């Protein structure tokens, strides 16, 4: 490369990337099941067509002198069979490939995406565009690809754009929450997908005056109480990421979510009925998500990168502090439930895509052995339990609770295959832009 295009890391990625290493990275996974076997050559062509419109997706994480940053690349992502790499994390590497990977197996295609690139809603837009273009090519469309997407709008750091320098800042959450006694098994990731009809859970949630998220979180809480007796003596907290695109106008595919929390204090009891848990859970999220409180949280994120003292501290000193802060943030959560809502695909694409899945991924470096995620498509709610070991009792208890409530429940599993590996190191350009990136100027 004769030049060195780069982007300042988005505000949330400062924290996400602090724990990234050559053997681990915070990674989520999105899958689509087509009605035909995946063609990897056409998948690559679809990816090439999208590249000019989503520049931030074609970047990789780098350590700078003061801050991490994202180096844009002219290379394509790794595209391989699931037999080689299935659900493996995106790690720090020196081969200049983008921080996402595409894998395929029979009729399933999966995007493994580093959280440094974006969140589930932002990167999900790219994933939807990718499978849309793939489907067009599979159906014989071979003309020049033109998109209405604006690459500049897609790469905006929305946190920085909506940060108010003199605005009030939300306080840090310091409460310690119940955690399972987890044994992390090296490079293990076992997924259990729990599927149930969307209409059924919507109806039952409405009867109780709850959202679908509140209803399912209540099931998760009761499942914890049934799984571990120690949960009754601690505060149970489920972290629920909130998409800020419904509060602020932005088209960015980069990170723009904040954490909200659902708390339940058992006070020594483990025999709570679901109705009792509903009473406590109802309305908690709504109270946290006023426009005023959301702005305070955005200001809190922005105050980190705009702290005049922190800005001049070298990264080698700053990173251990950020790592500790990131782990501390997750000490206040028992687990995470990410619900991206309903996936609505274009009509022609929907005829070819049978189902979709969202996987929160491995959060063991945060101290969370099991995370959960959900997406609705084609009348089904698909909830994934991501385990970093083989202890699946919590998930099994939640399934039994759902069945006892009369839900039609189906389950299936997936497991990580292959190992983390990266390509050979490639030289980067030596130029003024690279120095600017390294020193974040």
Question: Model-predicted segments: where are they?
Answer:
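Acyl-thioester-dependent acyl-group transfer interface
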Residues: 1-66, 74-101, 226-441
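Non-catalytic, low-complexity flexible loops and terminal extensions
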Residues: 1-11, 105-108, 117-125, 129-203, ...
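Acyl activation and transfer enzymes in specialized metabolism, enriched
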Residues: 35-52, 112-128, 193-230, 383-385, ...
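Short, charge-rich amphipathic segments
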Residues: 55-64, 138-158, 203-219, 324-340
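Short, glycine/charge-rich beta-strand/loop segments that flank catalytic centers
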Residues: 61-71, 99, 104-108, 143-149
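Short, well-ordered alpha-helical segments in soluble proteins
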Residues: 130, 134-138, 224, 285, ...
């Amino acid at each position: 490369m004769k030049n060195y295009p780069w982007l300042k890391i988005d505000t949330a990625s400062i924290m996400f990337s602090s724990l990234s290493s050559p053997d681990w990275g915070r990674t989520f996974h999105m899958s689509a099941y087509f009605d035909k076997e995946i063609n990897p050559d056409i998948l690559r062509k679809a990816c090439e067509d999208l590249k000019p419109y989503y520049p931030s997706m074609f970047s990789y994480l780098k350590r700078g002198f003061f801050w991490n940053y994202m180096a844009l690349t002219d290379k394509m992502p790794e595209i391989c069979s699931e037999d080689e790499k299935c659900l493996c994390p995106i790690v720090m590497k020196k081969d200049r490939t983008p921080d996402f990977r595409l894998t395929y197996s029979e009729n399933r295609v999966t995007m493994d995406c580093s959280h440094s690139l974006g969140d589930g809603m932002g990167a999900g837009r790219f994933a939807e565009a990718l499978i849309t273009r793939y489907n067009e090519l599979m159906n014989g469309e071979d003309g020049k690809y033109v998109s209405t997407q604006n690459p500049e709008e897609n790469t905006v750091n929305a946190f920085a754009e909506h940060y108010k320098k003199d605005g009030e800042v939300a306080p840090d959450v310091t409460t310690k929450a119940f955690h399972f006694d987890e044994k992390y098994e090296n490079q293990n990731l076992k997924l259990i997908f729990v599927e149930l009809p969307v209409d059924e859970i919507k109806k039952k949630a409405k009867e109780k005056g709850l959202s679908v998220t509140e209803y399912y979180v209540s099931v998760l809480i009761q499942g914890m109480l049934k799984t571990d007796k120690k949960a009754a003596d601690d505060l149970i907290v489920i972290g629920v990421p909130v998409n800020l695109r419904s509060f602020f106008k932005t088209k960015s595919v980069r990170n723009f979510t904040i954490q909200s929390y659902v708390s339940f204090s058992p006070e020594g009891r483990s025999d709570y009925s679901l109705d009792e848990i509903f009473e406590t859970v109802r309305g908690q999220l709504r109270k946290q998500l006023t426009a005023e409180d959301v702005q305070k949280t955005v200001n809190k994120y922005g105050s980190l990168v705009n702290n005049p003292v922190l800005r001049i501290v070298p990264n080698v000193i700053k990173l251990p502090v950020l790592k500790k802060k990131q782990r501390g943030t997750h000490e206040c959560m028992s687990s995470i439930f990410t619900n991206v809502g309903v996936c609505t695909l274009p009509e022609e694409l929907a005829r070819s895509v049978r189902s979709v899945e969202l996987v929160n991924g491995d959060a063991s470096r945060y101290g969370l052995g099991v995370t959960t995620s959900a997406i609705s498509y084609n009348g089904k709610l698909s909830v994934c339990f991501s385990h970093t070991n083989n202890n699946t009792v919590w998930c099994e208890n939640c399934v039994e609770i759902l069945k006892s409530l009369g839900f039609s429940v189906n389950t299936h599993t997936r497991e990580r295959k292959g190992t983390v590996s990266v390509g050979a190191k490639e030289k980067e350009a030596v130029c003024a832009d690279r120095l600017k990136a390294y020193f974040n100027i």
